[in-house]
């Protein structure tokens, strides 16, 4: 049963100590991007644009899958090891 009488001494953490880090040109260049962290705009923002790109990427993957599965037949596109090995 916990009684709150621990023999462990609490470690004293110096809150004033902060490691300075390394300042690099790339870090200086990317600093404005990090200044916007945590700020959320009201509304949908760019969610609609992101959804459009996700749908386009899904359609691209579906087309690739159909070509690979030979569900989508294209002229001069065949999926066999022999045609992949031919040097044109």
Curated annotation (Swiss-Prot):
Subcellular location: Plastid, Chloroplast thylakoid membrane
Induction: A monocistronic transcript that is strongly expressed.
Gene3D superfamilies: Photosystem II reaction center protein H
One GO term (biological process): protein stabilization
GO molecular function terms noted in the UniProt entry: phosphate ion binding
InterPro entries registered for this protein in UniProt: PSII_PsbH (IPR001056), PSII_PsbH_sf (IPR036863)
PTM annotation: Phosphorylation is a light-dependent reaction catalyzed by a membrane-bound kinase. In vitro phosphorylation is incomplete.
Membrane topology summary: Single-pass membrane protein
Positions of transmembrane segments: 48-68
Alphabetically ordered keywords of this record: Chloroplast, Membrane, Phosphoprotein, Photosynthesis, Photosystem II, Plastid, Thylakoid, Transmembrane, Transmembrane helix
GO cellular component labels: chloroplast thylakoid membrane; photosystem II
Signal sequence segment: none
Recorded phenotype for the gene knockout or disruption: Loss of photosynthetic growth, cells grow normally on a reduced carbon source. While all other PSII subunits are synthesized and are inserted into thylakoids, they do not accumulate.
Modified residues (Phosphothreonine): 3
UniProt cross-references to Pfam families, sorted A to Z: PsbH
Subunit note: PSII is composed of 1 copy each of membrane proteins PsbA, PsbB, PsbC, PsbD, PsbE, PsbF, PsbH, PsbI, PsbJ, PsbK, PsbL, PsbM, PsbT, PsbX, PsbY, PsbZ, Psb30/Ycf12, at least 3 peripheral proteins of the oxygen-evolving complex and a large number of cofactors. It forms dimeric complexes.
HAMAP family cross-referenced by the UniProt entry: PSII_PsbH
Protein family according to the UniProt entry: Belongs to the PsbH family.
Function (record text): One of the components of the core complex of photosystem II (PSII), required for its stability and/or assembly, possibly playing a role in dimerization. PSII is a light-driven water:plastoquinone oxidoreductase that uses light energy to abstract electrons from H(2)O, generating O(2) and a proton gradient subsequently used for ATP formation. It consists of a core antenna complex that captures photons, and an electron transfer chain that converts photonic excitation into a charge separation.
PANTHER family (alphabetical): PHOTOSYSTEM II REACTION CENTER PROTEIN H
Name this polypeptide is given: Photosystem II reaction center protein H
Species annotation: Chlamydomonas reinhardtii (Chlamydomonas smithii)
Lineage: Eukaryota, Viridiplantae, Chlorophyta, core chlorophytes, Chlorophyceae
Gene name, Swiss-Prot/TrEMBL: psbH
